[in-house]
């Protein structure tokens, strides 16, 4: 079982969610999860996420939504118009401390879930891994370089599938300038 985007699913309950994943793993369950290193999420405005009650469920307002095509913050009127039109929004809804808690956790991997890149798109489309190395390793010291590389490469998945040990199997190689 893989739980996607634990940070944007759990929000302020990230600590509880991380402990639940850790407890399940300690009991031998094959469960993984990932976080992305941004305080904003991104999705299509026409999705069911924005059905009636979305403001109460997420604890945000129209102004916390940013229309990707123009960069503008939404109002009740522009929300209705753009929702009918269809398109992508950036959702400003997470606190930096929630993100750092998720990134630091030994039970998480780093995921980007980047959408096809377009001007104004969520930065995770191109900058997720550089952000982890720059902000959480170099600047904040929240992770060691070794731990960060383990979180951003498919090493965990290769170990789980056994491909890291099989002769002739592909192995990830990351080359970068730090």
Positions of PLM-derived features:
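Acidic, glycine-enriched loop/beta-strand segments at the rims
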Residues: 90-93, 99, 140-150, 157-178
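Residue-level signal for alpha-helical context at structural boundaries
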Residues: 39, 117, 151, 166-167
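Alpha-helix boundary/capping residues
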Residues: 106, 155-156
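Active-site neighborhoods of metal-dependent hydrolases
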Residues: 2-142
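N-terminal alpha-helical segment
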Residues: 129, 152-153
């Amino acid at each position: 079982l893989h739980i996607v985007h634990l940070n944007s699913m759990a929000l302020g309950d990230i600590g509880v969610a991380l402990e639940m994943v850790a407890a399940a793993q300690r009991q031998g369950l094959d469960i993984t999860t990932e976080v992305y290193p941004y305080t904003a999420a991104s999705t299509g405005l026409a999705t069911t996420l924005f059905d009636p009650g979305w403001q109460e469920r997420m604890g945000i307002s129209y102004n916390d939504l940013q229309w990707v095509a123009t960069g503008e913050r939404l109002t009740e009127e522009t929300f209705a118009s753009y929702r009918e039109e269809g398109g992508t929004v950036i959702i400003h809804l997470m606190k930096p401390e929630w993100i750092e808690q998720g990134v630091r956790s030994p039970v998480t991997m780093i995921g980007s879930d980047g959408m096809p890149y377009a001007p104004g798109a969520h930065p995770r489309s191109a900058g997720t891994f550089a952000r982890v190395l720059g902000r959480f390793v170099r600047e904040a010291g929240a992770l060691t370089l070794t731990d960060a590389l383990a979180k951003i490469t498919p090493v965990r998945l290769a170990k789980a599938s056994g491909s890291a040990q099989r002769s002739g199997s592909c192995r990830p190689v990351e080359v970068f300038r730090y």
